[in-house]
Amino acid sequence: MNTDRIENSKTTENSESMENSKGKGNSESMENSKGKGNSNEEESSDDSFSDDHESAETRSGSYPDFGMRIYGCGRPVRLFVAGLHGDEWKDTTGLLKRIKPPKTGTLALIPLVDCGKYISTLNPDYYPGVGKKIVRAIEELKPEIYVELHSYSSKNLEKLAGKNRLELIGVPAYSVLKEGVLLGSVSPWIRRKYFPKESLCLSFELRKGSMESRKFAACMLEILKEIQSLDEFIEYMKKEFPAQAKKAMEDYQRFYGEI
């Protein structure tokens, strides 16, 4: 399975594919995929992501899409990921595949991380295992803004947004925004290990099967792809969702000790 594909925002549907071997002894090779329906060549899963945020490659003719896309260049770098486990890709992957490039900075997208067995991101084994492509992207791109898209069944709403979540699960409860979309922080495991305190790390939960949830989440992503910093997002939340912003900040300070 090729997990290192990157799609250029400037390419068309019949894009050229490029294998990046920058920094290695092997020479760069390029295969023209225009007009081809398949290829038997695979890149090593240990290859690094390209340092050039405008170079790109995608896996064609397949869905779900395991490829990575990078739009734009420069700072800030925003990394959005979706379809982290189970069948959540059905509600989230399409949102990242349709998003447009940012006006400034870089936007890196992993539309689908894994569609296999459901393993919670709160499980310490998730990111070193199933989510290792996320870790590799974070290590190499060093994003200031990191966003995960998840989806939930209505029966699990209380588990995610209930007031006793911290006592029962060990992490703060999600805040309810609009149209069934919930907002919280990402797993403490990845937040503490890979991001400085000034980074913006968010987790959205969409209600499964809800077009309204998808539309609202898409609007939030359009805002976040242009956000420059944690402080800017806090100001936006204070203006648009004051009650949720207050709760989120209090929960974060209680859990992490600072914001």
Language-model segment annotations:
Residues 1-259:
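Structured catalytic-domain cores with a bias toward divalent-metal coordination
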